[in-house]
Structure formats: C-alpha cells, structure tokens
Amino acid sequence: MDPVVVLVLCLSCCLLLSLWKQSSRKGKLPPGPTPLPFIGNILQLDKDINKSLSNLSKAYGPVFTLYFGMKPTVVLHGYDAVKETLIDLGEEFSARGRFPIAEKVSGGHGIIFTSGNRWKEMRRFALTTLRNLGMGKSDLESRVQEEACYLVEELRKTNALPCDPTFVLGCASCNVICSIIFQNRFDYTDQTLIGFLEKLNENFRILSSPWIQAYNSFPALLHYLPGSHNTIFKNFAFIKSYILEKIKEHQESFDVNNPRDFIDYFLIKMEQEKHNQPLEFTFENLKTIATDLFGAGTETTSTTLRYGLLLLLKHPEVTVKVQEEIDRVIGRHQSPHMQDRSRMPYTNAVLHEIQRYIDLVPNSLPHAVTCDVKFRNYVIPKGTTILISLSSVLSDEKEFPRPEIFDPAHFLDDSGNFKKSDYFMAFSAGKRICVGEGLARMELFLFLTTILQKFTLKPLVDPKDIDTTPLASGFGHVPPTYQLCFIPV
C-alpha cells in the first residue's frame, strides 16, 4: 500500500480517536471552549494565560475545562471555587497534576512534583526537619539576621552608585537556604554561587515563556527538538551535580548523634528506614528534595524582594511611612527582630501588598484529583489535572477594592491595624501550601526592614515614569530589570 495512504489512514484514525476521547469525557467535566483535535484549546489562549483565564471565566463561570493537547484540565477561578477545593476538599484535590518539564527534571522524586505516599512522607519529613533546624524559632532568625548584615555590607560597597539589585538579593536568600541544607554560606563573589543564581534566574524566565506552555502541552513531540527546555535540563543538572558532591561529603563526615543540616537528617532517616517497604528515603529522593528546597527557597524570595524594591521606588510615599515606622519601633542601631513585626502594622501591610500585587506565581503548580470527585454539578475523573488561579483570588474586587492599584490599605483596618485576609494566598493554601512559608515570611520582613533601616532608595528616573509591568507572564511574573542607588543613612 502507498505509504502516503497509510499515513492518511493513521492520521484519520488518530483524529477520530481524539474526537471520541474528548466527547466521551467532556460530558462529565465542566463546560469550556470547544477544543480542536490534537492541540486542544492552546490557540485560544493569549501568551498572558492569566488574562485568558479571566476572560474564559466570564464566559463559562468559575469552574471550566480547557484542553492542553488532548488532556483535559479543570480550571478553578475565584475565591469560592479555590477555597472549596484547596481547603474544604483538600485531600481529594491534593495530588500533583501533569507538569511534564518538571516531571522530566524530578524523575518522580522529591517533594514538589510527587503525589501519594511518597509526597506525604517527604513533606512530613521536610516540615519536621525544618522545624528541628529552627524554622519559626530564634535559631533560624539569627541566621537570617546575620545574612542581612552581609547584605548591608555588600550594598555599602556600591558606594551609592547605580546598581541592579538582582544578584545581591539572590545571594542573600540563597545563603539562607544553603545554611539549612548544607550548613554553609558563600561569599558574594564565589563563582559557584554566581553560577547557581544565573541558572535559577534563567530557569524562572524560561518557565514563564510561551515555549514552556507549548512543551507542557506536547512533551512527546517537542522533547527531542532544540529549544529552551534543554537549557532548563542543563541548568538543573548543574545544580544537582553540586548537591550530589555535598551529599557525598556529608556521607563521609556526618554524626548520627549530632546532625548539622537537612542532608544529615535525611541520611540518618535513610539508615533508620532502610528495611521498610516501600523504600522512600532513598538517595534519589534526597538529591531531588534538596534541589526542590534550593530552587524554591532562593528564586521566589529574591524575586519578591526585587519586585518589592521596584514598587517602593515607584511609591516613595509608602517607603517614607515604612521608614518612619522602623525609626519609631526599632530605631537606627538595633537589628530588626521578628517580634517587632506585631508592632509594625504598616510595614506588615506593605509586605503583604507587595506579594498580592506582584502575584509572583499566578497559578498554583497543577493539582490533580486523587479519586473520581463530584464537585458542584460535575464529576471530575481521578487523575484529572486541576489548574488553580491564585491570581483571581489576589485580585478579587470584593476583598481588595481597585486591585490593580498598589495600596497597603488593602491590609489595614480603619484604625490602621494590620488586617488579615483569607484571600491572601501568595503561598497557595491547604495541603499543598508552600513548605517554606515561615522561612520566606521571615526573610522578607528581616531583609526589607534592614535595607530600609540602613539606606534610602534613590531611583534613576522620576517615580511616575517607573514601569512595574512584568517582562513575562507565564509560570511566574518576571519583574523588569532596573537600577537604583542605595544611599546610606
């Protein structure tokens, strides 16, 4: 038979199979735009996927279905739908959804991209160990305060000249997480540290590009083609190779009775669990969970700080109020402490508003349902990917009047006291809430207050001309590059 005829027949069969699969499953799922064969709804989405999700929610409601390729994804938009799934039905929606590029990197190990018993074991261990290492206690606070001092000294070296804060802020947050995982910090000129930060920053930019959205929709097709996904694989291989070296060093020197850091605690657990089945405390899980913590603990915090400084340059009246509160509560010579935060409602509100406004990760990492779930009037089959729009919660007009405006009053009551909000989901919510939330909150408060205690921020242009629009909006919101001067006070 003519090869062309065979090809046409095969494609026709695939087309019919695709249409059948979509129509057969679609009856159980929420409504949504009609998908095209093979490619689904990908052509109907803007490169700013969050804008597309917002528009689709107006047409189909807060719960709707999209197809990325031939796989359905249920989208949750708005506070009520998000709360109902993440909190009220947390267990049923707790699995990790498809994220092919991350699955390729993690290999089914670690904490971020696993599900089921492995995820529960890794998460439980990580939370316990981070507490043992001082998360939420004065021990870890002292480490962050010490790093804040190094950060100040590095900023002084700029001599009040224009500088891009990206690298120095990355060094500070990276050193904190390194002290937890490896029990060591780097000098800000260390080439290994520079390499880490360059690769993490590059990965965040690439993950927020349209190419990765396409890769995650068609991994089998695009995996073997040239493209920026290969850069992500190469960068993570570099980081994992360093972590592997550190693990080997720890294997030769750790003391079971005196664990020094996260790796030591994991090695001890490996020895304790080596006869248990299924075996979860393995070398591969250690390597990947350390990479998970390293990546998540560095890039998100440093990018939030970088975006935060840009917003403070844009809004000098806010900066002045924060510095007045610092002078009143802490003074100029005493180091900020976490206990100061309760007496600094305006600063606390500013930190929350920075995170709300920048909306760093607009959609949570994909979830999946652990079983067939009856949700509202729909039935979502086991394993279906769930996309949760955190952006829709952080920009809800009912909770945050004029959400497009940067305004710390969103988190202040009429008396000027800090006002908590259930809508603040910058760290997600429920069973998959960020493991390092406590550490991130500590770093953001101590680093930002220390910087504003010691320096005046001077923009290079008129504040009204500062553009805070993200460079890219995909996996994350990538802040624009900028320079400023740190003027010692």
From Swiss-Prot:
GO terms for biological process: organic acid metabolic process; xenobiotic metabolic process. It comes from the Eukaryota. Induction: P450 can be induced to high levels in liver and other tissues by various foreign compounds, including drugs, pesticides, and carcinogens. Its EC number is 1.14.14.1. PROSITE patterns: CYTOCHROME_P450 (PS00086). Keywords: Endoplasmic reticulum, Heme, Iron, Membrane, Metal-binding, Microsome, Monooxygenase, Oxidoreductase. GO terms for cellular component: cytoplasm; endoplasmic reticulum membrane; intracellular membrane-bounded organelle. InterPro entries: Cyt_P450, Cyt_P450_CS, Cyt_P450_E_grp-I, Cyt_P450_sf, Cytochrome_P450_fam2. Its main location: endoplasmic reticulum. It is a peripheral membrane protein. It catalyses: an organic molecule + reduced [NADPH--hemoprotein reductase] + O2 = an alcohol + oxidized [NADPH--hemoprotein reductase] + H2O + H(+). Heme binds at residue 434. Signal peptide: none annotated. It holds the Pfam family p450. Its cofactor is heme. GO terms for molecular function: heme binding; iron ion binding; oxidoreductase activity, acting on paired donors, with incorporation or reduction of molecular oxygen, reduced flavin or flavoprotein as one donor, and incorporation of one atom of oxygen. It is found in: Endoplasmic reticulum membrane; Microsome membrane. Belongs to the cytochrome P450 family. Cytochromes P450 are a group of heme-thiolate monooxygenases. In liver microsomes, this enzyme is involved in an NADPH-dependent electron transport pathway. It oxidizes a variety of structurally unrelated compounds, including steroids, fatty acids, and xenobiotics. This is Cytochrome P450 2C41. It comes from Canis lupus familiaris. The gene is CYP2C41.
